[in-house]
Amino acid sequence: MVKVYAPASSANMSVGFDVLGAAVTPVDGALLGDVVTVESAETFSLNNLGRFADKLPSEPRENIVYQCWERFCQELGKQIPVAMTLEKNMPIGSGLGSSACSVVAALMAMNEHCGKPLNDTRLLALMGELEGRISGSIHYDNVAPCFLGGMQLMIEENDIISQQVPGFDEWLWVLAYPGIKVSTAEARAILPAQYRRQDCIAHGRHLAGFIHACYSRQPELAAKLMKDVIAEPYRERLLPGFRQARQAVAEIGAVASGISGSGPTLFALCDKPDTAQRVADWLGKNYLQNQEGFVHICRLDTAGARVLEN
């Protein structure tokens, strides 16, 4: 039996639309991510468990984990009879890389079960392909950090899909999921087809400056450059209370904040534990909309997807 855990991730990080993402893990030790188990069997089966299992498609062939198994078998050129279990702990359409968690855990578990026939680059390419079936286009800003850990910059040149960017140990990521769903496809459809020249220049300056600040170890500058001129101005209308929440967390002391992925999760970066706690308390009282919402104080998950049992 192989059991794989794949962590939540926060894509875009305001400054890097479709090209930056970070894997995150709660500071209290809770596992924020999906788990997939693979066991040898006579025929294929898929069992869904976990807090959000009831939100998955009722038709098994529509389940992305089934599609991962099917695509993996196609890649190897043979049917691999296994019993798979998906522990769906991540809310769907949350902006926390929920589909990436399932895809990464499923493909990594299959690869481990079969003795690692695929290398990490090929596996990551498959992960992007499968996750793209849900989001509507192939992009790696959730699957790459989820699989490899840390903060990842998408390269997609010279057979390199992504590479790690050094993060800051003192940064605490407060993630607030309000409990409503925003589909990635809907959030992409709301964006303009073309952008003004000054927005393109500002975006390039922010992203280049952010990467420079990470490598030159300037956390205050990096946080200051986490600005979004590409998606947030258009997407915030999908997120009730988002603008007020951003203003409130800044007043409490967050050094940066924005939309996690395509939303509705809000991320707020803090450089002190007491500030992070106050931000989390405010968001818990004011940004959550129902019982399914939650707030976690996280750090970068530098390990990425990992085998829990083998």
Swiss-Prot record:
PROSITE patterns from the xrefs? GHMP_KINASES_ATP
Broadest EC class assigned to this enzyme: transferase
Q: Does the keyword Kinase apply?
A: yes
Q: Where does it primarily localize?
A: cytoplasm
The alphabetized UniProt keywords are:
Amino-acid biosynthesis, ATP-binding, Cytoplasm, Kinase, Nucleotide-binding, Threonine biosynthesis, Transferase
Note the InterPro entries from the entry.
Answer: GHMP_kinase_C_dom, GHMP_kinase_C_sf, GHMP_kinase_N_dom, GHMP_knse_ATP-bd_CS, Homoserine_kinase, Ribosomal_Su5_D2-typ_SF, Ribsml_uS5_D2-typ_fold_subgr
Record-listed E.C. numbers: 2.7.1.39
Q: Which SUPFAM superfamilies match?
A: GHMP Kinase, C-terminal domain, Ribosomal protein S5 domain 2-like
- What's a Gene Ontology MF term here? homoserine kinase activity
For this chain, the family text in UniProt reads: Belongs to the GHMP kinase family. Homoserine kinase subfamily.
Name the chain's protein.
Answer: Homoserine kinase
Tell me which species this is from.
Answer: Escherichia coli O157:H7
